């Protein structure tokens, strides 16, 4: 009966249900996992501001996370800013610090079309890893959420169009973010810069900014775009 009622619903409403289910379910699972940490007394936390520059890449997500970069023919790029705050120090009881973020990217389309802008919102899992044979460490981050753009980037639209006539991307898509950051305060020469100041630490690092349809959940077929670049993040 439920299947019959769903079949009678209008196309736009079915699409809305389809697009909404995945991010809502994933967010509920993540937030459910961090609720335990907050109930156990984790309060307050740090805020952080990231500014980054990223260029469109033809590289698949599988290899893009290790820095494999193949420039898109359009050579378009984005400049983004992201604000985040600590959410929890654990995820499902595991020592994985979680943060929530909102971001604003601006896209330079290199005269292929008008420039665009967008918004991202996501939850991010973080892990601090010591560099082998040293006493230094790097911070790894993996974020999952939603991305909305005022105008679909040309490199993304081309990725969909090559899959068939009339195939297009969507303004609302799934969002993934992968970061590798090097905190600067751990270096003795730079540590005095952060004493008695408003900025507790600052990092320089690599970022992958990824939009995709999640194998056709957000659009007619699978597809997406990667932007790869570098940025700075200040922790308050």
Where do the protein language model's features map onto the residues?
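Cleavable N-terminal export/targeting peptides
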Residues: 1-43
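Short glycine/proline- and aromatic-enriched beta-strand/turn motifs that initiate or cap beta-hairpins
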Residues: 36-86, 218, 233
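Residues that define the transmembrane beta-barrel architecture of outer-membrane proteins
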Residues: 45, 73-79, 115-121, 171-178, ...
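Transmembrane beta-strand segments that form the barrel wall of outer-membrane beta-barrel proteins
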Residues: 49-55, 62-70, 97-110, 204-212
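Outer-membrane beta-barrel domain signature
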Residues: 66-74, 110-114, 166-167, 217-221
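A glycine-rich, hydrophobic loop/mini-helix early in the fold
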Residues: 82-106
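Outer-membrane beta-barrel transmembrane domain signature
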Residues: 85-89, 100, 113-218, 234-236
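Long hydrophobic alpha-helical segments typical of transmembrane helices together
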Residues: 220-236
